[in-house]
Amino acid sequence: MPGQPQAAPFLTFDVRSMDVTETGAISLVPYTIIPRNTPFKVSTEFAFGGGFATWLVSLGLTWFAKFYVESIGPGYEGELGSSTGATVAGQVSYGLPTTAVSVAGIANPGTYKLTCAITIGTGAVGPPSPIAGFVEGPMIQIT
């Protein structure tokens, strides 16, 4: 999903995808159907583009990713987990390390929508830079 900025050919920022995987044993059910009390992991990918992308990532900027869940109907809504890291010189595409999620907050079976917000900043203190992106991920069903 296009993020901000979208100033081609100078600088673009895109959050490309969001994935869900179950932890533990291999299962024949899709990763979007998760038994209650079974932990799962979420991850996402994002990329910089344009002529200034290589210069920007060389600054070692900190990225912040927060994963959220929203029930479809009554149920739990809130933050699932977060991840942080830093940009690396010469690397414009990033696949986040998976973030383990405890489903303790998701007590009710039901259908839930996952989302992720990524902001790029100069550190944990202070406002983020005007680089941000969002992705609505897959729907999951807690059974």
Name each model feature, range by range.
Residues 51-53, 74-76, 123:
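Eukaryotic short linear interaction motifs
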Residues 75-91:
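Solvent-exposed serine/threonine-rich low-complexity stretches and specific carbohydrate-binding patches
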Residues 2-19, 83-88, 102, 121-143:
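Short beta-strand elements
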Residues 23, 36-37, 89-91:
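Solvent-exposed, conformationally flexible loop/turn segments
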Residues 40-45, 61-70, 95-141:
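Internal, hydrophobic beta-strand segments that form the core of beta-sheet-rich folds
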Residues 57-61, 81-84:
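"Short basic amphipathic alpha-helical interaction patches in structured regions
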